[in-house]
Amino acid sequence: MELDVIFSRELHKKLKEKIKGKVFCRVFDDELYIRIDMDDLYFETSYENFVTRVCYGLSTDYVLYEVIEKYERFLINRVRKYYFKG
């Protein structure tokens, strides 16, 4: 198995432990794509230069932490838009 497949599978497993919804992780053209679908919400993020970043120490735990932070901000902004004016 190649490193990108192992990394994306491990990240998927860790994200599923923390997040409700459908989680999709994939490496394509040296870019790690992450998508989370829940109800009618769709969150996407990506990491460019995947191979170089892994060589310099990018770990699934670090990406997990960053994705959770971004996803939390995304959800908070959605709630604000739905419940508050302006």
In which residue ranges do the predicted regions lie?
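Short edge beta-strands and adjacent turn/loop segments
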Residues: C25-I34, D39
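Intrinsically disordered, low-complexity regulatory segments enriched in Ser/Thr/Pro
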Residues: R35-E66
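Negatively charged, low-complexity tracts enriched in Asp/Glu with abundant Ser/Thr
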Residues: M1-V27, L58-E69
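Coiled-coil-like amphipathic alpha-helices with heptad-repeat character
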Residues: K13, D30, E48, R73-L75
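N-terminal cationic leader/targeting segments used for protein routing and processing
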Residues: K14-E17, V23, F50, R78, ...
